[in-house]
Design a protein with these regions (language model features):
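Membrane-proximal intracellular helices of multi-pass ion channels
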Residues: 1-206
Length: 206
């Protein structure tokens, strides 16, 4: 199940390239590499926090960590354990994954990996401009340059996303819910994630 969730979070255009035999193009895909890096890094960190505290076996820790990381990252919404009772480190990692979401052109919701990567690279470029004001720096995704208008559009989208997140969180909080429940309710709703934390944890419902 974990494997199929991860596959569903991949840009479907890459499967067409795979069928067409364009393997080099797939290997150079920035979003795919970032997506898999997010998943693998999250799985390892969560498994390390679970091992010896929540689960005794290494295999068991990895299995639960991989499943839940895939579920949250791809916004599938499944849960095989009460991750609200997991160590704080594991919960923080899952919370971060709720913002990211799957790849563009996939079944996943959230901000999308390619937008996160582009925004990160744009931030790095802005820091480079501070050190080298006359420098020329370009954002490249999968070897292709990203125009400034696209980068600014992504920045605008992310700003609007966080604005709606803040607004929705406030509205849910006004109804008498705690901040954790309010925030993750808003986040899960915007990103189509499913379970969150607090009153909407994996063992509870909306």
């Amino acid at each position: 199940v974990t494997l199929f969730m991860v596959m569903a979070g991949v840009n479907f255009a890459l499967y067409y390239k795979l069928i067409s035999g364009r393997l080099r193009s797939i290997r150079r895909d920035t979003e795919l590499r970032a997506y898999l890096a997010f998943f693998l890094l999250a799985t390892v960190i969560i498994a390390l926090s679970l091992h010896g505290e929540t689960y005794q076996g290494v295999g068991e820790s990895l299995r639960y960590a991989a499943f839940q990381a895939a579920s949250i990252l791809t916004t599938t919404g499944y849960a095989t354990a009460d991750f609200a009772a997991w160590p704080a480190v594991a919960q923080i990692v899952l919370f971060i994954l709720m913002f990211v979401g799957g790849s563009a052109g996939s079944t996943g919701g959230g901000i999308k990996v390619v937008r996160v990567v582009t925004l990160f690279k744009q931030g790095l470029n802005e820091m480079k401009y501070l050190l080298h004001p006359r420098g020329v720096f370009r954002i490249r995704i999968s070897g292709e340059p990203v125009g400034k208008h696209i980068a600014y559009a992504i920045s605008g989208f992310v700003f609007l996303y966080f604005f709606l997140l803040l607004l929705t969180t406030m509205l849910v909080a006004i109804a008498g819910n705690d901040i954790l429940t309010s925030l993750t309710t808003a986040l899960a709703t915007l990103g189509n994630i499913g379970p969150g934390f607090g009153k909407i944890g994996p063992t509870l419902n909306y």
